[in-house]
């Protein structure tokens, strides 16, 4: 039955991180986050409206109430908590390393040496990690991750850090020039949360309850199977924790 009283739930995400947030062939928003929010909206009597917003514009859009929430594979950080409220975590991600195929890099310590070059995306968690923990390496920054990846492919850099999924997918495409080191090296994994406006306790509570339910009833498992089966299998084979 059509619920005529359904209230719009306006969601901001950057449709540039498949298979979490992406657009299908017709330009319609799709992916794990969209499926999850469709289910959330249905259960709570909302009508889902997705707005594709560039990453840097997401938090400003939330602060000015142009959107009700952000679900965009966003890591919960202390910095962000100052300006938005987060749901409980729905996923966790670890940084991984992409290195040239014939490099001598086997772990993070190998990169913390004079003469080692890192190609990193400016402002990414990999960039922040390197500044804090790798004092001896040279850090070269790029605005786009693809430019940083190219440095590794061409052998101009010894390492690129990004989330495990991106590193795995990049290695799949460039197996003749790169290697992926997927074992986690951070002390703490990164947790992803859904951001709501500061003080929006009601929406946060609904989201928290639905996330907890979805972990129990297998919604996240089935989304993982639907969108990331090969990755899930690879992670399992290598004893790596999956996102959910």
Give a label for each model feature.
Residues 57-60, 72-82, 129-132, 153, ...:
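A ligand-binding cleft/hinge motif common to bilobed small-molecule-binding domains
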Residues 2-74, 82:
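Extracytoplasmic small-molecule ligand-binding "clamshell" domains
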Residues 12-17, 51-56, 65-77, 101, ...:
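Beta->alpha turn/N-cap motifs
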Residues 15, 91-99, 164, 168-211, ...:
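Periplasmic-binding protein-like
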Residues 34-43, 103, 109, 122-124, ...:
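Extended ligand-binding regions for polar small-molecule ligands
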Residues 125-142, 179, 211-244:
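Ligand-binding clefts/hinges and TM-proximal coupling segments of bilobed small-molecule sensing domains
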Residues 34, 50-60, 105-106, 140-154, ...:
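Short helix-initiation/N-cap motifs at beta->coil->alpha
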Residues 100-117:
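Flexible hinge/capping segments at coil-to-helix
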